[in-house]
């Protein structure tokens, strides 16, 4: 039995490639993914926790389908349950190994924290009846609720976002006291706004999380239970496995597809990387490059429609458009991102002279699609429903039901009671970290609104940047990346959308969707940007490579993510805004050629090895082509054309010799 437990997990088409053991994967997740550091429950207690998480998922379904409650009641109940489950699952310190143990202080904190939010639920009508004139008891309850949510955040999400929230709360007190008000008055005002109104903890972020995000996380859990990730990997193998440097291309395709379902760049890097990274190394790629390809591709899963990262749902709410519109406008930038990585891995394979996987070791596309293509039905149906104008909640619930139905033909994935509970459990657990991050981010957004800090930031940035839009964009990018080094994507987006996005829109005149997409992108790429590049470090751990070098290569592979947001900020035609068919076609063609030029220049190879001058011509020409404009397009074509011509001449000379 022990031998079976330690067996190598191998879903690769190459039989002799050793992938990581389940223990290896778990160890890496615990190191780089805070959500994986949980208490050790066994036996009956483990089953109790399991069913509580499943019940939480059912509660979310009930609240969205049947409950006709006041929004503040629903959100407070949601946060209270999240606190209970978080304390049951996450210990005070990382690496806790005690089994079936929860300290008495954790029980006290859990009861106090959840009790604060349940107190508001029970006394809701009384509290809103006297508006801002909350009692001393209600102030104490609010303080407890905020403080214990902060401790929950430290355990589940991490310290960086907690530090940011603490700074903003301190600013709220500084602002109030600076106006000459007494501390007690300021305290009551801060607690009322941040705890009892929809301008704080139970604000828009938690509202979106308890509806759209939670339901889509649940949909992802059920979709994963159908075996769709394995299908995606096999599909990628059938499409690209035999081509030049096939395993790296398989990693790009499979990670893009699987990333839509997982929603976690670190989690996706570890799960798909345990298969793709060893295969890339066996083919001939360096460990650093293999880990970087997986990390960059997995991180991009959050920008890939139709199921983007949780922040995309918040973006739709904050911009005031349907999620379907956000997903539609994100299609081209996402395709460019993955095309850039795809081109780079192809050029690296050509430079190294790498081959693909033998065709007889790969699944055939036709038979594979006939056998398992039905697994795509829930995704296709989801896209169709969103385009047809279904509400996001309704579309997610129907798509989840379809995921259950499509699991039935295969006895290995058939949704029996055990698998059904497992999917509910996974959905409930995966919701916790997003919910906690949304609650704390709501505090930050609340302080910005309550104090007028947003207007001060606009004045400050405009004062520094003047009318130079590029300076404002650059400062915003740096802020996003620095915050993203320790703050989850969802919380990062909320912070940036309430602070920096208004600067770009109101101070610089940038399109609202483009500005929000800008901060969304840079919040995501923080996962592969040194020095705190968690997805890249996770890929490095699997590849057994140098972490910093892996992170630097991942940043180079994802160069499109650092360029594209600037382009659609200046010219939203890339997002299909204010443009016609000709404009869209032009920007697609020029951007693709431009990406090829940039990738070739950075890689140092086009049709042969590039010298310094050829690399500069390729990079500058590529950037000119990506930047919208007739003059820049002409300059770009000339420069990339010269570099390509020099390469062709060099290749002919080498062939003649």
Q: Predicted segments — roles?
A:
Residues 220-224, 255-264, 296-302, 445, ...:
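Transmembrane alpha-helix interface/packing and boundary motifs in multi-pass membrane proteins
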Residues 2-47, 328-430, 534-623, 651-657:
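Long, contiguous bundles of hydrophobic transmembrane helices that form the permeation core
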Residues 67-69, 124-132, 188, 192, ...:
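Membrane-interface helix termini and inter-helical loops of multi-pass transporters
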Residues 151-156, 160, 164-181, 187-230, ...:
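Core transmembrane alpha-helical segments of multi-pass membrane transporters/permeases
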Residues 136-140, 199-212, 238-252, 283-289, ...:
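Membrane-interfacial loop-to-helix junctions in multi-pass transporters
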């Amino acid at each position: 039995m022990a031998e079976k437990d330690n067996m190598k997990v191998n879903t690769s088409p190459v039989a002799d490639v050793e992938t990581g053991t389940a223990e290896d994967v778990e160890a890496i997740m615990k190191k780089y993914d805070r959500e994986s550091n949980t208490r050790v429950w066994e036996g009956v207690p483990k089953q109790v926790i399991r069913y509580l998480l499943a019940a939480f998922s059912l509660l979310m379904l009930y609240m969205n389908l049947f409950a006709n409650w006041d929004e503040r009641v629903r959100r407070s109940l949601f946060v209270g349950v999240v606190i209970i489950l978080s304390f049951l699952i996450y210990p005070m310190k990382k690496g806790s190994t005690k089994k079936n143990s929860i300290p008495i202080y954790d029980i006290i904190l859990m009861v106090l924290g959840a009790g604060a939010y349940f107190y508001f639920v029970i006394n809701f009508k009384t509290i809103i009846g006297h508006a801002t004139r909350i009692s001393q008891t209600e102030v104490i309850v609010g303080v407890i609720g905020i403080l214990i949510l902060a401790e929950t955040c430290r355990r589940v999400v991490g310290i960086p976002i907690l530090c940011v929230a603490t700074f903003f709360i301190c600013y709220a007190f500084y602002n109030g006291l600076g106006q000459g008000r007494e501390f007690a008055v300021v305290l009551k005002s801060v607690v009322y706004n941040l705890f009892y109104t929809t301008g704080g903890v139970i604000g828009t972020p938690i509202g979106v999380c308890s509806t759209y995000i939670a339901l889509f996380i649940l949909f992802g859990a059920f979709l994963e239970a159908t075996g769709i990730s394995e299908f995606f990997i096999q599909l990628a193998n059938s499409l690209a496995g035999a081509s030049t440097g096939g395993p790296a291309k398989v990693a790009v395709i499979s990670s893009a597809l699987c990333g839509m379902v997982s929603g976690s760049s670190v989690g996706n890097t570890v799960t798909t990387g345990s298969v793709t990274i060893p295969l890339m190394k066996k083919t001939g790629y360096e460990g650093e490059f293999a880990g970087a390809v997986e990390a960059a591709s997995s991180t991009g899963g959050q920008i890939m429609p139709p199921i983007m990262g949780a922040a995309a749902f918040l973006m739709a709410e904050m911009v005031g458009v349907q999620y379907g519109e956000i997903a539609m406008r994100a299609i081209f930038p996402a395709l460019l991102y993955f095309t850039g990585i795809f081109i780079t891995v192809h050029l690296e394979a050509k430079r190294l002279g790498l081959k693909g996987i033998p065709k007889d070791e790969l699944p055939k596309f036709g038979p594979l699609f006939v056998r398992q293509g039905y697994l795509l039905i829930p995704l296709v149906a989801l896209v169709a429903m969103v385009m047809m104008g279904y509400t996001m909640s309704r579309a997610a619930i129907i798509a989840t039901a379809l995921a259950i139905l499509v699991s039935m033909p295969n006895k290995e994935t058939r949704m029996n009671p055990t698998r059904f509970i497992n999917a509910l459990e996974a959905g409930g657990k995966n919701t916790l970290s997003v919910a906690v991050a949304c609650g704390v981010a709501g505090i930050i957004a609340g302080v910005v609104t309550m104090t007028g800090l947003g207007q001060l930031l606009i004045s400050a940035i405009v004062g520094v940047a003047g009318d130079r839009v590029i300076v404002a964009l650059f400062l915003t990018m740096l802020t996003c990346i620095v915050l993203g080094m320790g703050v989850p994507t969802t919380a990062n987006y909320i912070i940036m959308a309430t602070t920096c996005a208004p600067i770009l829109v109101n101070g610089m005149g940038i399109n609202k969707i483009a500005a929000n997409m800008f901060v969304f992108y840079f919040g995501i790429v923080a996962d592969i940007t040194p020095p705190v590049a968690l997805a890249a470090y996770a890929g490095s751990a699997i590849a057994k490579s140098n972490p910093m070098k892996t992170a630097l290569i991942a940043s180079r592979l994802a160069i499109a993510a650092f360029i594209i947001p600037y382009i659609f900020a200046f010219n939203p035609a890339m997002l299909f805004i204010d443009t016609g068919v000709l404009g869209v076609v032009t920007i697609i063609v020029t951007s693709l050629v431009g990406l090829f030029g940039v990738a070739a220049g950075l890689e140092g190879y086009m049709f042969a090895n590039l010298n310094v001058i050829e690399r500069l011509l390729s990079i500058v020409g590529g950037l000119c082509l990506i930047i919208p404009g007739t003059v820049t397009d002409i300059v770009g074509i000339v420069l990339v054309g010269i570099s390509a011509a020099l390469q062709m001449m060099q290749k002919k000379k080498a062939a003649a010799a």
